[in-house]
Amino acid sequence: MAPPENGILEVLENLLDRYKINLLQMMFGTFIATIVFFGGLMTFVEKYLPNSIRQSFRYGKHSFKGETDPLVAWLEVPKSWFKHFYTFALFWSWLAFYVLVSTVREQKEAPEYVLQFLDIMGGGRSHRKVEIDSTTACVGAFMLTLQCTRRFYETNFVQIFSKKSKINLSHYAVGYVHYFGAVIALLSNTSGFVRGSKPMEFSLDKLTSQQILYLGVFFLAWQQQYASNMILVNLRKDPRTGSVKTEKHLLPKGGLFNLLSSPHMFLEVVMYFCIADLYMPVRIWRLIFLWVASNQTINALLTHKWYQETFREYPKNRRAIIPFLL
């Protein structure tokens, strides 16, 4: 029997194209709406919320301490599982970076299976347009790949997770979806990855002043985030032996912690801003930045409140996530 003229993927692609359904935009738009809605509830009316919502939203140092909901507890996994989606992010980002560099080097359109995948995720072949040149894409992909690589290293070989710390399964799943979508968004509107387009040649001479500036800002934020994370790691280590002495959350001092309760979250926002502004013509990257900024801000506010309630001597000049402001 001959195979059907249209395969399942082609039917799906035509459906998405016909109704202008952009799966990437839907994903991150949903993330933004969810974090803003529940984050607002947690910030302003948390005491009136059922324990199931409070328990689902909170984790880590500001995890819910009241009477737990059995069903929500059943849906929790160890916080150390963060390392799983950073392992995925490492593989996925390097794969995309390799495909991008190969396409630019060979000066030919991406393979058909890549184009079809991007058509499905990015709104259909007739709605995907070239908005990003190859040099910008290489810079942005390099940034995100570098960040994924360092976070993989930290979560798998450096970070000390409390054995008692849990996260809701939804947080765990969102980690995978975030990196899955963000990496795809690097290519979805890039020359050579849109049908009928050819990648442009890459050259360091073609780097613009904006790209050079953002590379510098990104590297500084990248390095400072690592330094901030190491301060948190060292709080749980014996300074003489280097062995783990506690799994408690202690008061961090030094570096950007002298200004902020969560400098690592502030720096995450800075790094994503650098990528998103380079990709400014692409709507999906504006959504990704808004998602990251809102998520990190809500988490930082909850963390800041926990520090203030836990440590009487907590410095009054520290802000939650934006130096001197918030």
Swiss-Prot record:
Its EC number is 1.3.1.94. GO terms for biological process: dolichol biosynthetic process; dolichol metabolic process; dolichol-linked oligosaccharide biosynthetic process; polyprenol catabolic process. Keywords: Endoplasmic reticulum, Membrane, NADP, Oxidoreductase, Transmembrane, Transmembrane helix. This is Polyprenal reductase. Plays a key role in early steps of protein N-linked glycosylation by being involved in the conversion of polyprenol into dolichol. Acts as a polyprenal reductase that mediates the reduction of polyprenal into dolichal in a NADP-dependent mechanism. Dolichols are required for the synthesis of dolichol-linked monosaccharides and the oligosaccharide precursor used for N-glycosylation. The chain crosses the membrane at residues 26-46, 84-104, 167-187, 212-232, 256-276. Pathway: Protein modification; protein glycosylation. One of its GO terms (cellular component) is endoplasmic reticulum. GO terms for molecular function: 3-oxo-5-alpha-steroid 4-dehydrogenase (NADP+) activity; polyprenal reductase activity; polyprenol reductase activity. Disulfide bonds: none annotated. It is found in: Endoplasmic reticulum membrane. It is a multi-pass membrane protein. Belongs to the steroid 5-alpha reductase family. Polyprenal reductase subfamily. It catalyses: a di-trans,poly-cis-dolichal + NADP(+) = a di-trans,poly-cis-polyprenal + NADPH + H(+). Changing residue 96 to V: In strain: MEL11, ZBMEL145, ZBMEL131, ZBMEL229 and ZBMEL384. It comes from Drosophila melanogaster. It comes from the Eukaryota.
